């Protein structure tokens, strides 16, 4: 469409999908990139289509992150400051709130950089790295893809997403060298042998000064359950509709999340609330069930308030793990003659942490387009203009001879 006198094109740049549960092919549940059946349920017709190439919808987190970096790089390299025809930006939307259609082997959607419970996947953190600036990168960031809990004999590539100019990897304080840089943001360290401990990635700027750092630590055996609550900053309201997210994690004895834990957690709820449950890989996706497995050591469930305020106590138990308990309270809302004027959205504040739009330029010109005035061709000179006339339907051709196959 036209905006003023300029052409504006909107496009979807990455529709691939990946289950959050699938780290990589080197750790549980050992999912190779693209592995799965060749079918998907169409969002348009709601029919299952067989014998289609569904590999793009069956990523693991390693390959899903890499794909997101590659696809965004296609637009980032054409950002403002790189000529007259540029990408003006991007926004990340997801389709993870449905279990009525799917693509790939699972029977619910795995689209987007978070799952349906808004638990981040690795591409979420990759986008934090790539999008930390109005146009040009302003704040260098770094993220190590995956986890650091493997069997002793595993040798695997380690991927790091960073906006630094150089990235060095350290394992228990020993340097493993600098990563191979591709697509500006992706650094690959090939054939890294697993050793328990601390894996660190350090980013350096163009002057060789450290500008960002990230680390992964090997977690111990699963020992305990941890519960926490995510709710509105204004509190949980007893209006019969307000909901909170209950987060459950499996931790080691030192309080580190166990990235390979998939324990089945049983929940008990006491008090004025309705259990709405979460979602996980399985025949029925555990919809509404009070038995819910963690995936990669974490999951979430929704709890809805009733119209009666009060204290709600939730207990979580699992075989072989120390149980956990948490209490939360819902606050009353004013009701007159059976009606309430309370609208939850009225209390939500916009997130303005990014700050005001800058008044000064947010990018530097790195490339300037120059208009072509004329061209000289080895043949068919009268059609040489077709090589730069901005018409995709026209083209210049030579006369079929090698010695005339040139144009300047």
Annotate each language-model stretch with its function.
Residues 153, 162, 241-243, 381, ...:
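Short, surface-exposed loop/turn motifs at beta-strand boundaries within globular domains
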Residues 347-408:
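Disordered, acidic Ser/Thr/Pro-rich linker "stalks" and the adjacent N-terminal cap
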């Amino acid at each position: 469409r036209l905006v003023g006198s300029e052409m504006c094109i909107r496009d979807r740049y990455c529709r691939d999908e990946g289950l959050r549960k699938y780290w990589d092919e080197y750790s549980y549940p050992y999912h190779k990139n693209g592995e799965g059946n060749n079918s998907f349920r169409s969002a348009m017709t709601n029919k299952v289509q067989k014998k289609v190439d569904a590999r793009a919808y069956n990523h693991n987190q390693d390959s899903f992150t890499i794909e997101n970096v590659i696809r965004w790089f296609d637009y980032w390299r054409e950002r403002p400051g790189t000529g007259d025809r540029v990408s003006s930006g991007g926004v990340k939307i997801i389709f993870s709130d449905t279990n009525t259609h799917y693509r790939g082997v699972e029977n619910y959607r795995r689209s987007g950089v978070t799952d349906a419970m808004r638990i981040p996947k690795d591409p979420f953190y990759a986008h934090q790295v790539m999008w930390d600036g109005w146009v040009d990168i302003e704040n260098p960031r770094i993220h190590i893809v995956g986890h650091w809990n493997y069997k002793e004999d595993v040798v695997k590539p380690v991927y790091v997403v960073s906006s630094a100019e150089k990235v060095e990897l350290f394992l228990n304080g020993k340097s493993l060298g600098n990563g191979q840089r591709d697509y500006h943001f992706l650094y690959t360290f090939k054939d890294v042998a697993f050793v328990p401990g601390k894996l660190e990635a350090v980013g350096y700027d163009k002057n060789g000064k450290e500008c960002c750092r990230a680390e992964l630590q090997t977690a111990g055996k699963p020992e305990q359950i941890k519960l926490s609550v995510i709710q509105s900053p204004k509190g949980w309201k007893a209006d019969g509709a307000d909901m909170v997210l209950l987060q459950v994690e499996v931790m080691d004895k030192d309080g580190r999340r166990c990235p390979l834990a998939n324990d089945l957690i049983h929940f008990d709820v006491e008090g004025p609330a309705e259990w709405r449950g979460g979602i996980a890989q399985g025949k029925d996706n555990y919809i509404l069930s009070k038995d819910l497995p963690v995936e990669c050591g974490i999951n979430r469930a929704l709890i809805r308030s009733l119209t009666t305020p009060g204290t709600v106590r939730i207990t979580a138990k699992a075989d072989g793990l120390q149980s956990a308990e948490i209490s939360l309270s819902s606050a009353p809302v004013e009701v007159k003659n059976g009606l309430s004027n309370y609208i939850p959205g009225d209390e939500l504040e916009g997130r303005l942490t990014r700050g005001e739009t800058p008044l000064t330029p947010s990018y530097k010109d790195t490339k300037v387009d120059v208009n072509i005035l004329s061209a000289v061709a080895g043949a068919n000179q009268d059609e040489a203009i077709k090589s730069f006339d901005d018409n995709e339907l026209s083209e210049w051709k030579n006369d079929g001879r090698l010695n005339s196959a040139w144009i300047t």
